[in-house]
């Protein structure tokens, strides 16, 4: 048991020596001594201890004072067993409230010492094991996050055909998320734009996100014509996602195919938020779409697209509901009203400026509240 490091804190030299002897009898030889709470805190700052046996009544800084200091930074605080007299029960209760694991009477009865110290050390071992597994899991999730973010395009200057500018951002609510965006240069001189949202969050949604992105990219190459119909693209993706969909995972999507030279194209919306049109007028939602189910919900569904024309100077704002449904600490939604008010003054700005303004407005609104959904924004402007 020499690997177990213990700290004994007591202002009585007799008690310190007695406890050190009892610990040595049970195989604990790595024992550090401290005369009071000040020395104890200095020792804890200097090295790692598996357990602290802490006296209650001491000069300079007593046991309760030490526990209060340790509670201020519990990350590196070792487990504590309070050394007390049975007449100090009220103080013992206070110590437990401050985080002490157990208490030990000053008689230092060997069987009781063995049992209580052994129980505390075992709990610490299990906590350390859980912390290590959590650390490894977080490292794996961070790696997955990096891999997921690498799937979506970032170099929009090489993607956008002449006459178009594009910007986008995606912020998962967890390490990995279910939102996606796509900006894809088409061989016929056009561009494919898409924002989609997978039901659910976390790793399962992240896997479906990657699958959906792959299906859309593959379908864009399979559908014939210089400007493939977005309805046909989503129909191909739906065939892949709806087959054997036992988990009932759905994907909402808004997909646009646009001719960069003429500004003409088509749009297909599958259960998703409709884009906003950005120009000199107040931002307004594109309308006239047929209500269509999300991808994965209805196998064999025949999706339909609508004509779309983007005049020089006009832009389109595509987003996921993580923007409009962002919540503050009072669980109020950001809402479309705030979104439209935010878009109005930047409606003629560059796509990058619109994206930046959106993320800043949402961050200001939530004011540090935990993010509950993935946030994705994509903006395109012609001319």
Language-model-derived ranges and their functions:
Residues 13-32:
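Two-component/phosphorelay signaling modules centered on CheY-like receiver
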Residues 14, 35-39, 57, 62-68, ...:
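Acidic catalytic/metal-coordinating carboxylates
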Residues 33-51:
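Acidic, metal-coordinating helix/loop segments flanking the phosphotransfer/catalytic sites
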Residues 104-106:
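A Lys-centered signature of the CheY-like receiver
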Residues 131-315, 367-383:
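… and, occasionally, acidic/histidine-rich disordered N-termini of signaling adaptors
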Residues 234, 254, 306-318, 323-383:
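C-terminal catalytic subdomain
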């Amino acid at each position: 048991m020499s690997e177990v490091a213990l700290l004994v804190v007591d202002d009585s030299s007799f008690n310190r020596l007695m406890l050190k002897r009892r610990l040595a009898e049970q195989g604990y030889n790595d024992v550090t001594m401290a005369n009071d709470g000040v020395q104890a805190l200095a020792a804890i700052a200097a090295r790692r201890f598996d357990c602290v046996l802490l006296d209650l009544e001491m000069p300079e800084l007593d046991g309760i004072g030490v526990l209060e200091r340790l509670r201020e930074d519990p990350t590196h605080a070792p487990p504590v067993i309070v050394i007390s007299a049975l007449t100090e029960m009220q103080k013992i209760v206070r110590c437990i409230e401050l985080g002490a694991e157990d208490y030990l009477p000053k008689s230092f009865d060997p069987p009781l010492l063995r049992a209580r110290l052994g129980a505390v050390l075992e709990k610490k071992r299990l906590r350390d094991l859980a912390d290590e597994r959590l650390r490894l899991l977080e490292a794996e999730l961070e790696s997955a996050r990096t891999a997921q973010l690498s799937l979506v395009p970032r170099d929009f200057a090489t993607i956008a055909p002449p006459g178009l500018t594009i910007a986008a951002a995606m912020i998962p609510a967890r390490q990995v998320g279910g939102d996606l965006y796509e900006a894809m240069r088409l061989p016929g001189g056009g561009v494919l734009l898409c924002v989609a949202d997978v039901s659910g969050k976390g790793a399962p949604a992240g896997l479906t996100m990657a699958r959906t992105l792959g299906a859309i990219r593959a379908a864009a190459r399979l559908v014939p014509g210089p400007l493939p119909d977005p309805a046909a693209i989503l129909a191909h993706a739906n065939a892949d996602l709806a087959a054997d969909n036992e988990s009932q995972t759905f994907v909402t999507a808004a997909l646009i195919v646009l001719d960069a030279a003429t500004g003409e194209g088509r749009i297909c919306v599958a259960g998703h938020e409709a884009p906003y049109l950005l120009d000199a007028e107040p931002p307004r939602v594109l309308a006239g779409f047929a209500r269509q189910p999300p991808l994965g919900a209805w196998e064999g569904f025949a999706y339909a697209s609508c004509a779309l024309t983007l005049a020089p100077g006009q832009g389109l704002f595509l987003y996921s509901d993580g923007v409009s449904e962002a919540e503050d600490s009072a669980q109020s939604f950001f809402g479309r009203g705030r979104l439209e008010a935010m878009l109005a003054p930047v409606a003629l700005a560059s796509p990058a400026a619109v994206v930046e303004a959106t993320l800043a407005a949402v961050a200001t609104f939530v004011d540090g509240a935990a993010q509950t959904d993935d946030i994705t924004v994509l903006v395109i402007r012609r001319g």
